[in-house]
Amino acid sequence: LSERADFPNVPAFLGAIEYRRPKADPTVVCLLQSAATNEGDVWTLTLDAMGRYYERVLGRKADLQNETAPPGALLDELIGGIYPDKATQLGQRTGELHLALASSTEDRAFAPEPFNAMAQRSVYQNMRASLRRAFTLLERKLPELPKAFRNEAKEVLTAEEEILGREKRLLDRHTNAAKIRIHGDYHLGQLLYTGKDFVILDFEGEPARPLSERKLKRS
């Protein structure tokens, strides 16, 4: 990203050590990047903004009952600060990141690939397997849930086959999309705020998933 796509919102690549085997792709053992001066991660920034928002709401609880300002203007006033503008900026950086990831046509590891029927079925099977794991976990944890939520959890478990059936609709839809390399574990904790912009970190994918799955391109 920093060398070929000239994407500035990631730490600059400085070097890497690879393990190479005959007739196999090289494996990166360690990676050296530039340090990113920052004010903390964006998850903390968001929690701080939400905390201030709720403080303002509670502080104006009586006034808000008779508030006549348009909802959008009132929300901007209650959120306050720079957070709304920064959320817009983060959306722009996210789009630019994916454009950069899809920009390579020469490197096989990064070149976009067609989202064909095989890829479509693979996505469906992965989604179905993830849902199965979620239902299994929910059923196992059901006795530990607060009583207030158990009936709702049981309703979800009862609807398991219906929910899984709805996912199957994915196989009936055709698309001209492409698969590209993605971050793989993109959330606010993977972003640093510099005071003016954002730095995106940790492109190794979701650690709980197998490496073979993390290397797959997504649409």
Name each model-derived stretch:
Residues I182-G189:
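Canonical protein kinase catalytic loop motif
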